[in-house]
Each structure stands twice: as structure tokens, then as C-alpha cells.
């Protein structure tokens, strides 16, 4: 059976099948014979891969976005090879059958030579570093919220009904009362009045009744541990925020303009810039940006019926999950403008 061929649009290319311990690379093109080699994923082996590609005059490299395994390969090649593409694995699926690493790399190389692959948007190194910081900060903020919820469950176990009379258990009054309970103190009406805020809907007497329960030594120990964990995590968040501020200091004028958008706080602006950057030339139109950010419905039609759009991780990828979780209305309005 004759081999299926495609018109060749790229002179010399390489397709790489990336794994945890090994990468399989196939080169092909004008003036070179198709060749497949395997390299370990240690830095020295990846440098050998780079030298092999340079010696053969390869100008385009494509690989699947496999977990985080592609990142070291990309970092080694991005400064030496003119075009290093990360492509969506769903866009380069081969026909089912005899699947091997060599066949996968050959298939990627064949598609790349024919100009049938579309590169994913990989931000510049500076933006990738900023994104690592903002995503880690958001993860820590989620941990703080989780620990606060754990604290409230322990208080409920003690029959402390603070959440029933206070709308915001993270407010100044509620925090002060929880701190007293963590110290093992039996609250009195004078204690309540000493931290009472006039804007609270509940009266001091109602707060006292809600804070009367059966707090045991076991509960106090757990509450103290959780409070200590929250304090340490908040310190890490502050340090990350300072680091992010330093990295964005040279874009202060642009950040101030973005903060003029109603509802855009400093953190929202920092998260926005880390995810989509400041260079909009990467996106042909606002529709491309909305789609990439996971904020626009996709086309999912079968038998003439349009199915409900679903922005799952399968459609948007891990990065899309981060972007779609920035679900504040101002962010969405900004992207759609």
C-alpha cells in the first residue's frame, strides 16, 4: 500500500514525542533523510538533542503539550531553534492502530512539514514566571479559605453558632471573638462589647448566646493549630504579592490604567496581566482572546442539535481552568470588550 503524503510547506522540521524519562524525536525535510532518535530527559541529553537539531538545520520543532514534561524541552530549545511549537494533543491524533513512540514522532513531523499544525500560545519567559507566582498565590488564598471553613466546622462541633448571627465570619468582630475562643476564654458580655461593631445586625446579647457552647481542650488545640497555619500562609501571600509587585514595577502606568476599570482591584489586574499578558498582537481578534480564555461558548453540534457548552478541562486545558476561575464580572466584561 502506498504511503499517504502531504504537500511540504516547511523545509526542515522535527516532531518530538515527550515522556517522563525519554523523548523521541524525528527529523525530516529537504536535503536530509528521515531519522528518529531517542534522548533521555536529563539536561545533558536535551542539550544533545538541541545540538543534533542545529547540526541538521532544523527550523521548526513541534511537540505535544504533555503535562509538564514539555517544559524542560521547550526551555532548552526556545533560544536556539527559531520556531518551537507546543500543539494541542487533540489536534494531532493519529488513526487508531499500531501506536508507538517512533510512529507518534514521525506523525507529528509529517504534519508539521505539511503546515497542518497550529502552535499554542506560549507566553514570554517573564510572563510565565509572573504566572507561576500569581497562580501559587491564588492557591494559597484558596488554602486560607479552606482552613477558615475548617475552623467554622470545629466551632459548629462546639455548638458555637457564630455563623448563624454574623454574615461575615472573617470580619473584625467575628475574628476577635474567634481569637478569644482559641485562647480558651469563656466569653462574657463585656468581652463581646469590647470588640462589638455598631454596624452588626446582631446585638451583643445575641452574640453572647451564639458564642456559648462546650469548647473542650481538644477543640482549642485544633483551633490554635488552624489559626497558626492561616497566619503563616497569609505571610506567604504577602511575600508573593511583594515579589509580583517588583516584577510588574516597570508596567506601573499600564496597571494604573487597568485599575480604572470599575471593579478591578490590584490583585485582579495582576492576575489578568499574568494570564493574558499586555501584548494583544498574539490574538487576531477579541473573539480569539475570549475563546482562549475559556469565556466563550464553543460549537458542539450533533444531528442538527446544539448541545450545552461545557468549559471543562478537556476543552480549555489546565490554563483555561485558571483563567475561567477568574470569574469576576469586570474581568469577563474586559475580555469581551
Task: Enumerate the predicted regions with their spans.
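A detector of single, family-specific signature residues
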Residues: 1-337
Amino acid at each position: 500500500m502506498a504511503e499517504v503524503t502531504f504537500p511540504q510547506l516547511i523545509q526542515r522540521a522535527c516532531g518530538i514525542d515527550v515522556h517522563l524519562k525519554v523523548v523521541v524525536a524525528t527529523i525530516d525535510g529537504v536535503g536530509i533523510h528521515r531519522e528518529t532518535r531517542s534522548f533521555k530527559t536529563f539536561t545533558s541529553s536535551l542539550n544533545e538533542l538541541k545540538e543534533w537539531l542545529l547540526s541538521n538545520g532544523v527550523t521548526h520543532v513541534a511537540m505535544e503539550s504533555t503535562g509538564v514534561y514539555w517544559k524542560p524541552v521547550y526551555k532548552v530549545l526556545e533560544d536556539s531553534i527559531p520556531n518551537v511549537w507546543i500543539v494541542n494533543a487533540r489536534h494531532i491524533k493519529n488513526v487508531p492502530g499500531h501506536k508507538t513512540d517512533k510512529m507518534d514522532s514521525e506523525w507529528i513531523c509529517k504534519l508539521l512539514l505539511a503546515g497542518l499544525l497550529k502552535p499554542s500560545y506560549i507566553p514570554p519567559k517573564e510572563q510565565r514566571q509572573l504566572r507561576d507566582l500569581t497562580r501559587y498565590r491564588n492557591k494559597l488564598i484558596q488554602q486560607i479559605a479552606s482552613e477558615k471553613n475548617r475552623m467554622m466546622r470545629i466551632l459548629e462541633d462546639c455548638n458555637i453558632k457564630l455563623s448563624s448571627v454574623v454574615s461575615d465570619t472573617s470580619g473584625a468582630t467575628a475574628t476577635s471573638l474567634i481569637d478569644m475562643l482559641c485562647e480558651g476564654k469563656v466569653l462574657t458580655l463585656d468581652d463581646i462589647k469590647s470588640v462589638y461593631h455598631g454596624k452588626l445586625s446582631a446585638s451583643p446579647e445575641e452574640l453572647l448566646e451564639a458564642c456559648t457552647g462546650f469548647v473542650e481542650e481538644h477543640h482549642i488545640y485544633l483551633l490554635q493549630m488552624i489559626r497558626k497555619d492561616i497566619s503563616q500562609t497569609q505571610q506567604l501571600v504577602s511575600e508573593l504579592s511583594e515579589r509580583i509587585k517588583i516584577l510588574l514595577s516597570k508596567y506601573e502606568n499600564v496597571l494604573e490604567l487597568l485599575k480604572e476599570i470599575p471593579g478591578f482591584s490590584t490583585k485582579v489586574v495582576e492576575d489578568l496581566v499574568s494570564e493574558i499578558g499586555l501584548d494583544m498582537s498574539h490574538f487576531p481578534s477579541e473573539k480569539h482572546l475570549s475563546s482562549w480564555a475559556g469565556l466563550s461558548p464553543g460549537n458542539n453540534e450533533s444531528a442538527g442539535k446544539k448541545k450545552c457548552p461545557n468549559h471543562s478541562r478537556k476543552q480549555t486545558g489546565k490554563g483555561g481552568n485558571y483563567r475561567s476561575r477568574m470569574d469576576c464580572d469586570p474581568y469577563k466584561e474586559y475580555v469581551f470588550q
